[in-house]
Amino acid sequence: SSASASGPGSSSGSASGSASGSASSSASAVASASASASSSGSSSTAAGVPTADATPADGGYAYASNVDTHRLVVQDICDINDIVGDYKWSEIAEIYANGVHSVKSDGSVRTIGGFAVGEGKKHGVDTYYGTPTPLDDFVSAALNGTGVWAGESDAVRKQGVQKGIMNQIMIAWVVHELNAALAKAADGNFDVASGAVHNWDEAWAFYHGAAPGCGPFATANKRAKDFGTLGSDGETALANEGLLAAMIDGRDALLAGDEAGTISAAREATKHVFITYAQATIKYAAKVYSDLEAGDTEAARVHQAEGWAFFRIIEPILGNNGIDTSVIDSILNMENEPGSGSVADIQAVLDPVIAYFGITPAEFGSYG
């Protein structure tokens, strides 16, 4: 069985929040893997051992297949992060659209923008927003200063560009690969070089990769510092530790041809991704309110943009599973002035999904 309506490893039903904040046992992720792409003509080679050319480990995860070039995509984000503070929009657009580091064996370049404009991906973001390319639409508008970003300062647009690329697109790419792995597993395609485990490996390559300080892995560590949820080393988020463990479990399940084990691991992986971006949603909403109390409306607008960019990563988890996202959207959406609602209003929307995933107070922490 593949993942259902909204993400890897979900079961039937939806996580609709009731007044008591309970959640039914189902919801799950940012994706829709119900479209389990058939792997017609693909290999059904029995699972086994890593390939001879398997990429060396990254961050404690031993790849089973070759993702030498996939793990370099995050280096493009390093290049973007180096210049985004100087608002070099045209240079960023060039890196985004044409890529730099992830050169494939045929000489073509794997690009962040190329993924963002791709239609029919298994991340569910398009399903939720009802448009074919919502990831690219968001980033391109921020780069060009159009749509909701028209008339906004460079500092505000920076949040849409940087968080849109580093987090929205990269997490959607991770989720797409997890769901692609589940779809191949459902088809019995456990070929190590090109089947389910290869997509699973790609998910870690896009999340951590060759430069973990530039991608989602780094965001998780920052939010853990904010919320008091760093691991025993004082540097790594509990969410990153949990995600790594889930990725290892899923890899091993796929090598063993264990589809059910992979579904369970994908659900656990989604839990830890959710923690990071739920934390980010709360943090930047709180900063908006404190900015306004201090009379700093420009800072409030910047933090609203940052919070909105982060919230859009988990919004499909909520919305695709029957939870009303309008309260948080009204607080963070850039179409609205900052300052409505409260952190408590946001927490009330998130609580049912926190309960569904079994996220403990120690795992989620607290801000401030």
Residues of each region from the PLM?
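Mature extracytoplasmic or organellar-lumen-exposed domains after removal of signal/transit peptides
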Residues: 46-368
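Ser/Thr-rich, Pro/Gly/Ala-heavy low-complexity intrinsically disordered linkers and tails
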Residues: 1-47
